[in-house]
Design a protein with these regions (language model features):
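Sec-dependent signal peptide recognition
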Residues: 1-8
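Hydrophobic h-region of N-terminal signal peptides that target proteins for export
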Residues: 10-19
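Bacterial Sec-pathway N-terminal export signals of envelope proteins
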Residues: 19-70, 87-88, 96, 102, ...
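Periplasmic alpha-helical coiled-coil/stalk elements that build and connect Gram-negative outer-membrane
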Residues: 24, 115-229, 234, 328-331, ...
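Small/polar (Gly/Ser/Thr/Ala-rich) solvent-exposed segments
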Residues: 41, 60-79, 88-116, 133, ...
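Amphipathic alpha-helical coiled-coil segments
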Residues: 42-54, 115, 119-142, 149-152, ...
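Membrane-embedded beta-strands of outer-membrane beta-barrel proteins
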Residues: 82-84, 284-286
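Short, charged, amphipathic alpha-helical segments
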Residues: 98-102, 165-173, 368-376
Length: 411
């Protein structure tokens, strides 16, 4: 029975620790990260913390029950007193406390929203870079095949005494350098995956695959995109509102709460020559603090300066967001033009030259190395195009992030 239990437990543990294979698109990876990133999950608890502070804010202090006892040490005379006291605000302090906490709750929610925006941007950048690396690796592999054809041709010419062994060695060295470049691309991929895994919230044993292709540049986004939906701007606005309410709260703090209550006393006193008499009295008790020495001036100055600073922060964050959008759009426009030029002029010209050399080679007018080198130049142009296309999509990601685009969480 024990062995059976151990066996079942082992199977359960093995199933629980089984490596997971994730196959995601660029946007799918961003959505997955928003749902599973552990740091973001921890950040969301700040909303619950702020909600708890909101529940606690604006409440009256608990009433106080006071007791008095006095005893004459030379006789039986003594007194007992009981008082019930409650503090009451002289201003709208409790309402202002609630308003400050409500604004802080809105700021916490906006900060989490901004964290989602920045996380999605980081994941998109890593995913786009991985797609570009895969395409770059394919191009380098084609270049290696092209170089191997040239090496085989040069080796035959060296054996026939028609070419120098140094030229053949140089071609072989270039091919090995390309092989090293492919290995370096594998290193870059490992680094990117190492960056992407914690962002997605997956373990080191899990396999992450990014699917999709880098599409050709499309229409540019419209100018003057709105930034009011960005989390950092909303957080700045909410913090400014909290600071504004805090100024009013600091001014209200000049007037401390007054206390009012009921009191009852019972005394046993000697009334000569009649003896001892008992007296019971009921009354009111009132306490009013006077703002003679502390008028809360320091806190008022501090709160006023903080409110001005928060207003300036809104302007700074909005200006930064607008600058990011303009810069990303300009980068997209420039890179789209580069891709269009390579597609419309350079690659067609390279293909035309390659076809001409192929025809000349078939006619015996051009040696094969020239044809192979022409193919290599075309591969280099395709590699340049891929770099420009990758940078275009990275600029598009910057524009998405700058406008506050956040994907829906993916389960």
């Amino acid at each position: 029975m024990i062995l059976k239990t151990i066996f079942i437990t082992s199977i359960a543990l093995a199933s629980a620790t089984r490596a997971e294979e994730l196959s995601l698109t660029v946007e799918g990876a961003a959505s997955y990260a928003v749902s599973h990133n552990p740091a973001l999950s921890a950040a969301r608890l700040r909303i619950e913390e702020a909600s708890g502070r909101l529940d606690a804010a604006g409440r009256r202090p608990n009433p106080e029950l006071e007791f008095d006892l006095s005893q004459n040490i030379r006789s039986r005379e003594h007194g007992v007193g009981v008082a019930w006291m409650q503090k009451f605000p002289r201003t709208a302090r409790l309402t202002l406390e609630k308003a400050v906490s409500r604004a802080q709750l809105a700021a916490a929610a906006a900060e989490v929203r901004d964290a989602e925006r920045r996380l999605a941007g980081e994941v998109r950048v890593a995913a786009v870079s991985l797609l570009a690396l895969e395409k770059e690796r394919d191009l380098r592999s084609q270049q290696i095949i092209n170089s191997e054809e040239l090496i085989a041709f040069m080796s035959k010419r060296v054996q026939a005494g028609e070419a120098s062994a140094v030229d053949a060695a140089q071609v072989e060295l270039e091919s090995k350098q390309m092989g090293t470049q492919v290995l370096m691309l594998d290193v870059e991929k490992a680094i990117l995956l190492g960056t992407l895994r914690p962002l997605l919230g997956v373990g080191t044993r899990d396999t992450v695959n990014i699917n999709g292709v880098l599409s050709d540049p499309g229409a540019l986004p419209a100018k003057g995109a709105s930034v009011v939906g960005r989390g950092d701007i909303r957080a700045a606005q909410a913090n400014a509102e909290a600071a504004k309410q805090n100024v009013a709260l600091a001014k209200a703090g000049k007037w401390e709460d007054f206390s009012a209550g009921l009191m009852a006393t019972h005394e046993l006193a000697e009334d000569a020559p009649d003896g001892f008499e008992r007296d019971t009295m009921l009354g009111l008790k009132f306490s009013l603090p006077l703002p003679l020495y502390n008028k809360n001036e320091g806190q008022i100055r501090e709160a006023t300066a903080a409110a001005k600073r928060r207003e300036k922060e809104i302007e700074a964050v909005a200006a930064q967001a607008s600058a990011e959008i303009v810069a990303a759009r300009g980068e997209m426009a420039a890179l789209a033009k580069i891709v269009a030029d390579i597609d419309g002029k350079l690659i067609p010209a390279a293909k035309q030259i390659e076809e001409q050399l192929r025809g000349n080679y078939a006619a015996g007018l051009t040696p094969l190395p020239e044809v192979i080198r022409a193919r290599g130049r075309r591969f280099e142009l395709e590699s340049q195009r891929l770099d420009a296309l990758r940078d275009y999509h990275l600029a598009r990601v910057k524009h998405q992030t700058a406008t506050g685009a956040t994907p829906s969480p993916k389960k």
